[in-house]
Design a protein with these regions (language model features):
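Ubiquitin-like/PB1-type beta-grasp interaction modules and other compact soluble beta-rich domains
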Residues: 1-69
């Protein structure tokens, strides 16, 4: 098994440790403190599942931070 997973994050290629969770990716990108929607392979990953959803080689991830204002 490969030690890295080659994934796409918001349109950019990225290598992450094999088995990294969506929550781990958010932490690596400093997005773990802000509200953030996550989608893996066009499927929404609820916040409660982000720590247990692991990333695999070839996954396409979209992370969208939520910003309020008016």
């Amino acid at each position: 098994m490969s030690q890295v997973a080659r994934i796409i994050v918001n349109g950019e290629p990225r290598e992450v440790p094999a088995g990294m969770s969506v929550a781990g990716l958010r932490a690596q990108l400093n997005l773990d403190k802000a509200p953030c929607a996550a989608e893996v392979n066009r499927t929404l990953v609820p916040l409660r599942e982000q720590a247990t959803t692991t990333l695999r080689d070839g996954d396409v991830v979209e992370l969208v931070t939520l910003v309020g204002g008016g």
